[in-house]
Amino acid sequence: MTAFPTCYGIIPARYASSRFPGKPLADIAGMPMFWHVYQRAARCPELCKVVLATDDERIAQAAHRLDVPFVMTRPDHESGTDRVYEAACLLGRDLESSGKAGLPDDAVVVNIQGDEPALDPRMLSQLVAPFTAAKDGARVRVATLAMAIDAAEAASPDRVKVVTAVNGDALYFSRAAIPFARDGGVQAGDAAAGPAYLGHVGLYAFRLEALRAFTQLAPSSLERREKLEQLRLLENGIPIRVVPTTYRTHGVDRPEDIGIIINLLGENEG
């Protein structure tokens, strides 16, 4: 087995949101949403440190009050991934200023969505596992999760689908229902071929060098067409290992999602 790399979890938390302004501070059972995400991520034993990355003083003040570690990032990032990379650089500088070595290029940085307060910590453990695989862990640069979905879910362009190679690396991500069944109808998955459709779960783990490479690449043509930033990696020859999961989570896109989350949290605690 490959030696386990140092793993850091970073939760990007942006106040501005067209559909839900102030989302990270949304009250869920008496605590802000980012607190729930942090508490769940901190339960992942493989993560040596979890921090919030924000550009907003209101979020920073709430994090300070609740003893949630945070770093302040620039407000002009085009994506959460760019914010995560800046936060990783800041963590490295903090280590260096304390007399320790900074983050090595093979360190693993996990981008933990700040609107997933019902996140199961076991998903994060699954996400970082490929980096230590005995066969090819050393070559894994980026990893993400996917789960089996049915045809109705696959038909929605809001549900991103992924197809993979035999070794588990992503071949393509799309909003279209892939793979297409040429003979009509929907092909049910079988034991050999796997499920008919894999739905992408938007958690990512990067080697630091791959995260840096992503931020230095221009948006790609397929990325612009599908509005999926992970295609930038594939178009530039950076492989993404796809890990199957059976754990479900539920993101918060709109205020009305809060009630669903409260019910999920109650079920999980019960």
UniProtKB/Swiss-Prot annotation:
Keywords: Cytoplasm, Lipopolysaccharide biosynthesis, Nucleotidyltransferase, Transferase. Pfam families: CTP_transf_3 (PF02348). The lineage of its organism: Bacteria, Pseudomonadati, Thermodesulfobacteriota, Desulfovibrionia, Desulfovibrionales. This is 3-deoxy-manno-octulosonate cytidylyltransferase. Pathway: Nucleotide-sugar biosynthesis; CMP-3-deoxy-D-manno-octulosonate biosynthesis; CMP-3-deoxy-D-manno-octulosonate from 3-deoxy-D-manno-octulosonate and CTP: step 1/1; Bacterial outer membrane biogenesis; lipopolysaccharide biosynthesis. Its EC number is 2.7.7.38. It is an enzyme of class 2 (transferase). One of its GO terms (cellular component) is cytosol. It catalyses: 3-deoxy-alpha-D-manno-oct-2-ulosonate + CTP = CMP-3-deoxy-beta-D-manno-octulosonate + diphosphate. It comes from Nitratidesulfovibrio vulgaris (strain DSM 19637 / Miyazaki F). NCBIfam families: kdsB, PRK05450.1-5. One of its GO terms (molecular function) is 3-deoxy-manno-octulosonate cytidylyltransferase activity.
